[in-house]
Amino acid sequence: MKRTVFAPTRLVGAMAAVLALAGCASISPDGLRGAVQSHTASRLPDGAELPPTDLQAHDAAQHRIDEWLRQPLDMDQSVRIALLNNPGLQARLAQLGVQDADRVQALTLPNPTLTLGRMVNSDEREIERQLSFGLVSLITLPWRSRWQGMQMEQATLTAAQDVLRLAADTRRAWLRAVAARQQLAASERMHEAAEAGAELARRMARVGNFSRLQQARELSIQQDTAAQLARARLAATAEHEQLARLMGLWGRRIDFKLPDQLPAIPQAATQLRAGDDAEATALRERLDLRALRRDLDHLGERRGWARAGAIFGDIGLGYSRNTATDRATGHSDVTRGWEIDLPLPLFDWGGAASGRAQI
């Protein structure tokens, strides 16, 4: 009869591998900003950076923003300022750092529990010692590490999508602000011409060369252009403030300058891909779709564990060493043994957890 000999070295090796896996989990020093930057670098202007976490680097970034604001802002500079200074993006990236810390916490093994007891009666004194820890947390660590990696990849892709969305919104706001400024300049010229026409009509009517009807028409044109000028000023102010909001500017910084007219259409814009190639590229490169795929993969892998984890999620393993000492003779008896705690699924069969995973 062939007997299987249990090799303690295998158990020790497996335990060491699991502990090493737990020890590898660490918080990213930059709050995963580098990972977000790698997903977005090719779609952002050259030199565009995300808000730094270091206080000294933050002060240097604010100094660069002040330097850029001294000159009329082009589109790329507006995007750079928005990425460095937008408070919403800063909060989103800070949340990503918190999620990274939660990932490390989820992969950290729970501390073992040491229980000490001392019981005395008239005949003997008993000392109880027990060391216990959660067995499920230790066994499932490799799977939980994989799941947490999927979740963090999804969170990173979502944050990268937020970065690209802010950059696109800033580009649109810059175009609208410059276009509104250009429209305001045209409205001012039209109003000046209408004022000159109304003044000429007034003088011509004074000497009898214009009728009252002709003068009234010129005055009506002047009033129409004045109303159009007021609307253009309101639109230019609103678009300017919208751009300032996206760039995170306030106070004296909102008095930044913009170009007087829109730039020419870039030559690359006339060579955009169309048809099936454009659709395939969009489906392949959209970060929000990639994030949804990772979320779907994560839910699919965790679905099978949801029910079992809800039922057997509190399995514990403990080692006990008790010493009983006879108070009369001083003789001590030592007992050693293992204990395992198994939850009994009398009330919770994991139906709610399984249903949640299926939704």
Regions found by a protein language model. Give the residues of each.
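Periplasmic alpha-helical coiled-coil/stalk elements that build and connect Gram-negative outer-membrane
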Residues: 25, 141, 157-281
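A small-residue-enriched
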Residues: 25-47, 80-137, 240, 244-249, ...
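Generic structural signal for well-ordered, non-membrane alpha-helices
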Residues: 73, 101, 153, 157, ...
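Amphipathic alpha-helical coiled-coil segments and their boundaries
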Residues: 75-78, 85, 92, 134, ...
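"Short basic amphipathic alpha-helical interaction patches in structured regions
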Residues: 95, 130-131, 143-151, 190
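Amphipathic alpha-helical segments that line or abut small-molecule/effector binding pockets
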Residues: 146-153, 157, 294-297, 357
